[in-house]
From Swiss-Prot:
It holds the Pfam family Ribosomal_L18p. Transmembrane segments: none annotated. One of its GO terms (biological process) is translation. It comes from Acinetobacter baumannii (strain AB0057). GO terms for molecular function: 5S rRNA binding; structural constituent of ribosome. Coiled coil: none annotated. The lineage of its organism: Bacteria, Pseudomonadati, Pseudomonadota, Gammaproteobacteria, Moraxellales. This is one of the proteins that bind and probably mediate the attachment of the 5S RNA into the large ribosomal subunit, where it forms part of the central protuberance. It comes from the Bacteria. InterPro entries: Ribosomal_uL18_bac-type (IPR004389), Ribosomal_uL18_bac/euk (IPR005484). Belongs to the universal ribosomal protein uL18 family. This is Large ribosomal subunit protein uL18.
Amino acid sequence: MNEKKQSRLRRAKSTRLHIRALGATRLCVNRTPRHIYAQVISADGGKVLAQASTLDASLRSGTTGNIEAATKVGALIAERAKAAGVTKVAFDRSGFKYHGRIKALADAAREGGLEF
């Protein structure tokens, strides 16, 4: 595994340990060059309460690897999380920089009503 990926995974592990210590429900984000995924995971880490990604039928028709798509995923995850009864989450960016698509998803989720 290359050094850049190892550093990202180390940051992700550290963040997840901190969130687990808080006992908070987390909004976990993962990105690939082509897609972006978001899950709301329960505080114990055992259950996915809501999920959204660019693979969803409603979002798949457009482009999937850009900031516009990440914004749509953020709005969709906020809507689904609220439907599941979740309003407060800890943002788990999986070690990715808070920039670009990750930032766009987080901003859209906040506008959709999720509290970080």
